[in-house]
């Protein structure tokens, strides 16, 4: 018979066991938020510092930990690889994402990084927009590892205007990944994740937030004469936006232009506002950060990239985009304070790559610059035809790499080495070229570090080209005659911000050298979970406190 004394003893024992379990639980934040500001050069933190408010970038700098000397440790420095490397702690040679696109030597065609014809679009009828998944990714992400550590009870969501910047950070088995459809102005996904859009996504889409954001056009946040960190408003090296005939403020017809082409919102600061509002909706819709099981939200802020590409780093448009993003971040952090609680969430902010100054801007200030070969594939194929008598020997030229068509070589009875040597010799004559490397012989190449290591890390034997080209400093692809671009090893493309704030983070900064690939191991160490499967980086001891 169970006496009152024995019953009370049993209750005390069970209560003690439950208390011990709670006490011994691994200390983790309720929510991790990984923010990637697309194309954010490290110096943007300080170029516009005097105009930032206290709640956005300055909050991270003044209450969090800033790493001032973080570089990307591979080439090419592009969006898909950047997001993959941040969240895998790995490099293209291992994780398999060798570019936004690459040439598939077996299929004989260009392949987009997240393209997947085995899945169907959800939320749109456009296959090109919706047929995407992480199947081309060979390694696990830190978000995957969190799922493995919690027996997949953690909620993981990726949000971006860009498909690749939502899909790759969220990993192989997230709760969801959502991206923007230019044809409808709504967020969508694919059947890789779900058969139908969750109610919270439909509710958000039905609010028609993009139209509301562009309704009043785009004018400068501050009086335009205060944008002293930027060039004058009307310069020849800036691109146009919408129906405006000059690259100048104000952009009064934005609402009309958006209705004609909904993807236009990408090239305005309001694309970032939209993304962060969608991120807020994801937190609410998935009840993220409400219990002791850590959740993970990945957010790519893509409009900084689109605005940067179109106008260039020294434009008033870019400065205004960052000042508005600063305010959006302050609102987002305030919402996290209310929903999750100060000290209960961990945020890190970085970038997938930087950007070069516009060629026109550099020329105006007597800096070394120029354009890379206008149409290298066409020009070189003409020379190869004359030399070897075969057409289309070069199958593709992308990511500063040259791919040879193996079938053409075989049919023409040509040796790869002979053709490659000839092309390398010809490329070395180009004034824009610094080095030309055979990807079969990178280890033996007599080029300095860190270029050599970055080429090795970026080379994927299955997906990269036969020749790697290193351009001279300041030389941009010919398609970037307006605005700017990125892809190279130089500091303007490879030097990125890295800030941590919130749970478990002390205030401070470090000038010690670190790499993009150190981010995922650092987050893994803070969460006390296994590193991603292909990680080559190491935890940043200043951040984790030991």
Swiss-Prot record:
It catalyses: a phosphate monoester + H2O = an alcohol + phosphate. Its main location: periplasm. Keywords: Hydrolase, Metal-binding, Periplasm, Phosphoprotein, Signal, Zinc. The lineage of its organism: Bacteria, Pseudomonadati, Bacteroidota, Flavobacteriia, Flavobacteriales. Its EC number is 3.1.3.1. Substrate binds at residues 100, 162-164. One of its GO terms (molecular function) is carbohydrate phosphatase activity. It is found in: Periplasm. Induction: Expression is not repressed by inorganic phosphate. This is Alkaline phosphatase PafA. The active site is at residue 79. The gene is pafA. It is an enzyme of class 3 (hydrolase). Heat-labile. Incubation for 10 minutes at 50 or 60 degrees Celsius causes 40% and 60% inactivation, respectively. Heating at 100 degrees Celsius for 2 minutes causes total loss of activity. Heat-inactivated enzyme cannot be renaturated. One of its GO terms (cellular component) is periplasmic space. Zn(2+) 2 binds at residues 305, 309, 486. PANTHER family: BIS(5'-ADENOSYL)-TRIPHOSPHATASE (PTHR10151:SF120), ECTONUCLEOTIDE PYROPHOSPHATASE/PHOSPHODIESTERASE (PTHR10151).
